[in-house]
């Protein structure tokens, strides 16, 4: 059985870890970094992921995707998506099923399809380290992700060629990373997770007793559209507004300028965590009829804090709700853990400290803790980690729409998973032969204000007066927090088939097609790599041949020289194309045409060898003619 890897699929950065010698180890990617930017770029002939994608973003803004996790499992008309539509340099579109998709070079792509590229890089990083194929993974998601978002994340894993053994909540994973080595005792831990695109708070009880550890999530809350990207956007908008005041030009209409502005804003935000002021300096940011324009704006830490103050305050309300749901007060919390890169901001740390009345722990790496926890959970599933029990919860209530468009809850939020619940329903009209059960997720009483997960149609009900047929619907939430539904007609005892017509998400056929596309792209990537290798070898051959021609000088007959030059030109032409066989053929012909060069080089080498031999003989002869002379030492006092 191969290793199960742990992946933190983040909004801004992603990370992969694996158990190595019983300890979770965060792996370095091909660029030598322990975290990988969650950025994907599409060019004419390849897909670029991570730091290389980030570096080329300024020159390719409309085909470079970042923060794609904010779109996963979401509808195009969602308010959160509409906010991003207006600020992202790339195109967000409405799919046929109403989902939010993206478009690059005329290709429409689902967020799970794009996210799969990041997962493929994480998979490759692990395979390079382990020296074997990896097919199984534990992937983390924000605790407040709904059913659609969790299912979409599993779809991304499948498209990347991974069997997702478990979906685990990010704060829970961080608590695992923190608590796995802790000794005896019972601790209440608050995990404050403010990442690139999402915010979660989880209250977790860690019970360590005689080597056994139980991690029980007591309550969770959050906001799946609040994170570092929103902090960046506040700064981006401020800079764009200031520039418009000074120059009268709106940078928001220029994707290239916006991409440069985004990079500069992110850099300035990070700098202001360790310094009180910085300067954003972007020469030639745009131009008009009067010439090029430059952006130079000074920003203080206080200014940044004033821009994002309401965002920080927005994180405090979920803290209050989570504590209330757990039936705890602030004083009951023993430790506070900060997770996510945005928690490095001093103002965020100050807000958390003031709320809990204690300093957060500094011994947890906010960028790596989640991946470490995922690797530990992978170890639990594979049997490599013993005596650890993880009890997670469903973040949102699940129920159905009943008469009067009211949501009736079957499973309350913060219920430990896996769990099941059933309820008996009946017909609303006489002789009704079918019922439609509308499944919802959320906390609102009004059905339409909650997330629609789908409609379950039950046909073939025997004619009877209203209220008489008894149809038992069962909700079953698995350990991934994903809902499964079945229904039984209690009169016949037969289980009826229910088709879940999801209001959004990818169908099984779409996922299967994307898996096939990914496999096809893997072959394309391999061919592209082989093509680049052939080009590089051909370029090296031409360079070496030119050098040999120069060294041969007049010793190379003009007829041979012309043949070699023609062969080199043929190689140059071939390397400009995309035919590997043509490049290899032209390279072979150049090698054959250069046969005379090899003869000249060998003759020259032999001549040099002969000259060295003669020189050696002469030196020996000269040595034989040397006469030993008598000498007398002259003392200073004889002078």
From Swiss-Prot:
Keyword annotations: ATP-binding, Chaperone, Nucleotide-binding, Phosphoprotein, Stress response
Residues with PTM Phosphothreonine: 198
Matches recorded under Pfam families: HSP70 (PF00012)
Induction remark: By stress conditions e.g. heat shock.
One GO MF term: unfolded protein binding
Annotated stretches, region: Disordered: 605-624
HAMAP family: DnaK (MF_00332)
Physiological role: Acts as a chaperone.
Assigned protein family: Belongs to the heat shock protein 70 family.
Name recorded for this polypeptide: Chaperone protein DnaK
Organism, scientific name: Shewanella sp. (strain W3-18-1)
Gene that encodes the chain: dnaK
